[in-house]
């Protein structure tokens, strides 16, 4: 077993004693849970569509290996390199999103994927974490240079990304991106009057989505009135939780995976509820809650606004996505095809999440021994007071 002493000055040694090992452990545990649940849920799906039983399992493992490398590699980066990589990555994501609209693969009326040698690549997944860091950079730079139009530029970038997502269309991803943007603007100290205006615009956007996108209207209608349309998938998901009880039917003994086409993706939480039971399902909820809250508590002691905004944006993205997926599975929210982070099948999602959490691990690493230094934005960083308090109540 490799051990690192506190005096070890190697790159890995310094990383080991400064990274949040609890957050890292929860990330790895959640990935492991995902592989186990995909092994339980996907063979029935693969058999139903004529593929080898472990087709989806092996493909997920194929993506898991680079995801682990990315997670560890990104967590080694200094703050300035997180920003640089995210800026380049976000600009590339925008180009790929435009390419998706032109030459992408269309499924169920949505054009969200690009085919790379038999692998479907979803650029919007990679836009989410890089967007959070990109806008955090612009908003924090406004503090270092008061004349810099950080609010305006961040808003323009958000609107461009939202526009590209709506053209696919992908209303769920749009909701996640918009929530990240609003959260970051709020943390950056935007006036409350502007927050009220954004809330009104958001409400108008929700009404517009209902009016303009028939599939959105149908899902909301079915959520409010189950007799207004087909609710087979949600009903099957609810029955799965009922069948599972407290301790589940046992691994491999569930039924819901044999009747739902996306049991290995959007409804993998229902598979967990049926085969592992309520207690295991609550443990999965606890994993996500711990992951988000642990990092947020760590950010309370942070003095670099860029770190707070970037990490906070990524955590909001992951937390909201988990809430939406699990909420849909138990019919607390209208149906929406959104994967459960680190657990559902999906290569693009897994790699993008590894990038995002790698960024968070890098940004939240302890930087001991520095009393007063300049950050990459030119701000003066001190060990105290906490970041949110130092922003004059911006949070």
Can you say where each PLM-predicted feature lies in the sequence?
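Short, Lys/Arg-rich, polar N-terminal cytosolic tail immediately upstream
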Residues: 1-17
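Short acidic (Asp/Glu) and glycine-rich catalytic loops that position anionic groups and cofactors
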Residues: 5, 216-217, 248-251, 292
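Hydrophobic alpha-helical transmembrane segments of multi-pass inner membrane proteins, especially
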Residues: 24-40, 46-233, 270-328, 355-359, ...
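Transmembrane alpha-helices of multi-pass inner-membrane enzymes
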Residues: 32, 331-374
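Glycine/serine-rich anion-binding loops at beta->alpha junctions
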Residues: 117-127, 167-169, 245, 249, ...
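Long extracytoplasmic/lumenal interhelical loops at the membrane interface
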Residues: 245-279
């Amino acid at each position: 077993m490799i051990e690192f002493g506190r005096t070890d000055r190697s790159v890995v040694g310094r990383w080991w004693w400064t990274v949040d090992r609890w957050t890292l452990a929860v990330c790895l545990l959640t990935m492991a849970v995902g592989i186990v649940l995909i092994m339980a849920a996907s063979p029935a799906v693969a058999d139903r569509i004529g593929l080898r039983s472990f087709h989806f399992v092996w493909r997920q493992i194929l993506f898991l290996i680079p995801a682990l490398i990315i997670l560890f590699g990104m967590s080694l980066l200094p703050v300035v390199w997180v920003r640089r990589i995210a800026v380049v990555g976000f600009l590339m994501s925008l180009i790929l999103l435009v390419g998706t609209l032109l030459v992408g693969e269309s499924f169920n009326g949505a054009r969200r994927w690009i085919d790379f040698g038999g692998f479907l690549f979803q650029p919007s997944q990679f836009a989410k974490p890089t967007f959070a860091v990109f806008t955090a950079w612009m908003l924090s730079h406004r503090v270092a240079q008061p004349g810099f139009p950080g609010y305006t530029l961040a808003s323009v970038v958000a609107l461009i990304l939202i526009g590209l997502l709506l053209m696919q269309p992908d209303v769920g991803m749009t909701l996640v991106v918009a929530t990240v943007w609003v959260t970051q603007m709020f943390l950056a100290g935007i006036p409350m009057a502007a927050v009220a205006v954004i809330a009104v615009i958001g409400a108008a956007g929700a009404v517009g989505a209902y009016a303009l996108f028939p599939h959105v209207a149908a899902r909301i209608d079915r959520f409010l009135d189950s007799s207004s349309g087909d609710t087979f998938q949600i009903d099957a998901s609810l029955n799965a939780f009922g069948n599972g009880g407290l301790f589940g039917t046992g691994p491999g003994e569930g039924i819901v995976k044999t009747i739902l086409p996306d049991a290995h993706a959007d409804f993998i939480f229902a598979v967990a509820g049926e085969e592992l039971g309520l207690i295991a399902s609550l443990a999965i909820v606890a994993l996500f809650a711990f992951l988000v809250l642990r990092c947020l508590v760590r950010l309370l002691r942070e003095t670099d606004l860029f770190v707070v905004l970037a990490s906070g944006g990524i955590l909001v993205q992951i937390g909201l996505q988990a809430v939406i997926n699990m909420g849909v599975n138990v019919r607390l929210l209208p149906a929406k095809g959104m994967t459960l982070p680190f657990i559902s099948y999906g290569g693009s999602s897994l790699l993008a999440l590894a990038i995002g959490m790698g960024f968070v691990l890098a940004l939240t690493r302890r930087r001991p021994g520095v009393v007063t230094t300049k950050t990459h934005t030119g701000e003066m960083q001190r060990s105290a007071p906490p970041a949110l308090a130092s922003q004059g109540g911006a949070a």
